[in-house]
Amino acid sequence: MWKKLSVVGMSSALALSLAACGSESSSKEEGSSSKSDVIEATIKDAAYVISSEDDGQSVDSETGLLEVNVKVTNKTNSSIMLDSYDGVKLYDGDEQIEPENVYDTEVGLDDDSSGTIGGKKVKNVKYYFNVEKDKSYEVGLKPRTKDVEDEAEEVMLKLDTKKYDDSFEALQDPAKAVEAYVKTLYFGEKDKNYDKLVSADKEKIEEQAKEAFVDRMSTATSGTNVDDSEMNKMYDTYKATLAEKAKLEPRVVARGKDKAEVKLKYSSVSLSDVYDSLGDYAKEYMEQNATFDREVAYEYAVTKFDKIMEDTDAKNSSYDMTIDLKLKDGKWEIDSSAVKDFNTAFGEGLL
């Protein structure tokens, strides 16, 4: 009799234990997947991003904006609503954190603020949270069903931000790519980030920059026929002067996974100033030699080009460049409109 009761007792205890485990696993599982009677959810991936809404200031050395991509399956036959206004939360222990509203479609950032999921359908949704590096959180998903009296259970997903440190460290790569691009192609410098981060037709862009300079100098020398070897020397001097005097201050103002927007504050050597200096030397030559031969006068002025570049200071641009980039095969491509701006600023020397 005692043995029989013991078996019954053990069976009852086991049943209660299994029931408890079943209830727990229905709302929370180890890892980044979880389910309830209404939904099944999985964190597919996540990455740190930068939003333009705060002009790129959402990131410091320890915190950042994390884009979390979640795959949600509606297990019911009816549509459900899972939106970031009241159905999605981030938990830091007892602290509840609301998701951020982000709308930067130019770089692929767009939260799913009103997500309807049809019956038996699967939807990939994105949510944005301000988080700390190397910290564990939980994402809570609580959908609304058509039956207002039947409140859905909140599903909890574990989120370990340490897994996404690589994306945090790469947030400023677009700015590094812009700086390496300009220094390599327009200043003639070697930048370690060029081969690592930049995708560009180097020969084509360098040729375009040189052509812009040559056209500008042809005007500045009043049509004087400057031979190719002399023009090449002038261009080399100009690039060396840019490398010495020009300043570049790029910053990422918005960045998604594979798109970015960079603002470039810069200074450059104005070829308008060089134009004026060449004219002054030509005028000086004509006055000293009592001649009106402008071609000969400008041939003399060209011989002073190195000194002119030495004496000419860089000037700050009155506006910041806006540069759009795309990530392709692990490297950043710069939009063609920005290349035109670079040619104007660092080829033609127009500020």
Sequence positions of predicted segments:
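C-terminal motif of bacterial Sec signal peptides marking the signal peptidase cleavage site
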Residues: 16-20
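Bacterial signal peptide processing site
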Residues: 22-25
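The feature marks short-to-medium sequence segments in extracytoplasmic or secretory-pathway proteins
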Residues: 73-123, 287, 291-294
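Short beta-strand edge/turn micro-motifs at domain boundaries
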Residues: 96-100, 150-152, 318-350
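Short, solvent-exposed, Trp/other aromatic-anchored flexible loops in extracytoplasmic proteins
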Residues: 100-138, 304-319
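Short, surface-exposed ligand- or partner-binding patches at beta-edge/loop junctions that are enriched
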Residues: 130-156, 337
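Core segments of small alpha/beta cavity-forming domains
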Residues: 164-240, 246-248, 273
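Mixed-charge, low-complexity intrinsically disordered segments
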Residues: 271-317
